[in-house]
Amino acid sequence: MQSKHILLSCLLAAGIMSCKKNEIDPLPLKDLDNTTNVKIVHASAYLTNYSVHLKVNDQRITNAFTYSTPFPGGGLNTGGSNFPWYFALTPGQSKITLAVPNVGRVTDSIMLYTGNVTLDAGKYYSVYLADTLTKTQAVVVPENKAIPADKTTRFKFVNLIPNVAAIDLYFAGNVVAANIPFKGVSPEFILPYTTAGQWAIRPAGAAPTTTALAIYPSGTTNQTIPNQRIMTVYSRGYNGITTGNRVPAISLLYN
């Protein structure tokens, strides 16, 4: 077995063989000594919403799924599940591949991204694949897994919209993360349990009365802040697109 092996005893059984499309979570793996813990988020907004698969160190780890789905786990306004799961890897450098597979096979048909990331032992990471074509990049974000205080939830914001200089994130009409550039990560912030409101993104410095690039949830629906969760808000898509798969959007990832 390769030295950069993936700990897939549960994943192969539960993640590939028995899962339906976009239901790709493996059983959670233990935080073993000398492992690193990872989730990968497909946030590359193509005009066509391809069915894709992920490989790590040339080993397929998912069945077919679509934009914007995390693996493993899920979130709000994403594919996937409602769980904050990660998978375990041997620490060090690992190769990540996102590709459109040949129909009915594990081989790659259209390569969307391949590149290396370096991950340390004993830590948790979310790896976001952002932008498209030759500009696709892996944005590696370390995770703080400390449980928040009772009656609070801890957030951070990751900006994955390439064609805006920087973004301000709002919740319930208030700026909670300011001037975050593409691939930037905000400082963590705390919101009180049961607070209700909508998320919105605007170009950095824009007045709060200007039209938002995106709002979540849509319409008059609010999100109510849960208790003692760890979540990442991330923006995706492209500014100026008004229809289809590439419109600006807000998603929340369970960490």
Give each language-model segment a name.
Residues 19-255:
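Intrinsically disordered, low-complexity polar regions and short flexible loop motifs
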Residues 1-19:
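Sec-dependent bacterial lipoprotein signal peptides
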